[in-house]
Amino acid sequence: LIIGAGAAGLFLAANLRGKSVALLEKNGSAGKKILASGGGRCNVTNRRIDASNYLGDAGFVKNILKNLDFKDILKFFGELKFNEQKQSQFFCESGAKDVLGVLLGRARQSGAQIFCGVCVKGVRKILADENSKIADAFSALNGDKFEGFCGSDAPNLQNVRRNLDEIFEIVAENGDKFYAKNLVVASGGLSYKSLGASDIGYEIAQSFGIKVVPPAPALVGFTVQKDEFWFKNLSGVCFPAQILLERAPQKSGDDSKSCSQSKSGDADTKEDKFSVCRETIGANLKQSSDKSAPLQTNDLNSKKVVTLAASRQNGEIELNLTANEAPLDKNREFYESDAKFNASQEIEFNGGEILNGDAKAWKSNQKNRTKIAGDVLFTHKGISGPAVLNASLFWQKGLIEINFCPNFSIETAQKSKKQLSTVLPLPRRFTLEFLSAAGLSDKPYGKYAQAEREKILRLFSYRFAPAGTFGFERAEATKGGVDTDALEADCGVKGVRGLYFIGEVLNVTGMLGGYNLHFAFACAWALAGRLNAK
């Protein structure tokens, strides 16, 4: 018995052979999310399927994906035509309705029955030594067969007596009861609430002692705080950009250590030397080949050689910068390990992080950074678009950074006598709103004062902390869910024979581009292989 007639549930039913299969669907019809996916065109897979495109346990994801590639899925939907578009996505030429039609047709060909309008309330496993539960199970018999089982191979009374410890009882909200030897939970996540999203899968998992990672909206836009309210004046404006944000920290060996810290000399030295994790506007700092030498940079504006040295005293780092052996302007701002600091400040060093006052620090481990390119779309609520939706998957309630001009050099503006809104490769409406929010007028770049230019350079590294997301109503997916540590490689629950979880209900979420549908199909394929072998 399968709870949920969505992508995972239907694909599983379509690939089971010689089984008595029933699907319970909460909605009045199956596959509502499928019909809404890809803007109604249903992007079923991606040529570049890889675990790196998912948030979740990489080992589990790799194992699920290894036996089903994009060609297998296209073959399954062989009678349909798919157009491969940018970023290797495959959209159905005739629309999502036909994709759902193939899934329903194949499931029914395999003998599956779909019961719609059935809202599951709870699940329990009947144990042989619980006489009252056995009596309840027997009372549900019609002749010598269980209700909820379909087909000639439904378990007879003799088999029921022998295998009562393997039977699940599924109770619907209207009081109906269904019984199954194998129970598959494919109920999805909490996204698209208007399409009948439910948390029943999480409740079932918890009732069996399985950990559920708190679900949160994913592939969703960001709302903004007061400083970014100017975004709302740009509703409808869309253009390519690049977003940089942190992934959750990795729990593996030296990965938790700073990539920017390296000791020079012996272990008792009082001086630490630093490399810098990324190129910054105006200066490209890099570690000398001599590990004991301080950092140097060619300043793009003054062509001076800038030297950075750091000394540790009582757990603090004092930064000293010089240009051609003369003290550097103390008000000049630099970036070290992606944390903004002032050259004259003392900055606390704590576990691989640089802290600037009470501002949140960006971790110095570049391995935990995610860089996402794509369109950004401004809305009346904040900011959305493919790049933002993908960024929301990895967002950890903190800062994000947007480069609004990823393929533009400020030197081009420096050489031009045209107004900035004309020179920049951005919608003029956006540039004017950005300048207005910064208290600047539109004029040639050369006519801005140095302090004003610093504001303009934020276009290349605009950092802000979103207020939140648009929520589950607007989310295309759910991150969080049933902890995959509780599952075997084929999605069976460890220690609970006959119980399985597949698809979006799991703590695995893919980026935009057909990755989530592919993962749902791949889970179902892995489980079908196990069940067909029984």
Which stretches of residues belong to each language-model region?
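N-terminal Rossmann-like FAD-binding beta1-loop-alpha1 element of flavoenzymes
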Residues: 1-23
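Short hydrophobic core segments
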Residues: 3, 178-191, 376-379
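Glycine-rich FAD pyrophosphate-binding loop
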Residues: 17-39
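An anion/pyrophosphate-binding glycine-rich loop and adjacent beta-alpha core
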Residues: 28-30, 35-36, 44-50, 211-214, ...
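Glycine-rich active-site loop/strand segments that organize a redox cofactor
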Residues: 39-86
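Feature captures the FAD/FMN-dependent oxidoreductase FAD-binding
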Residues: 67-148, 155-182
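A glycine-rich dinucleotide-binding beta-alpha-beta segment and adjacent secondary-structure elements
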Residues: 116, 436-509
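Glycine-rich loop(s) and the adjacent beta-strand/alpha-helix scaffold that form part
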Residues: 182-228
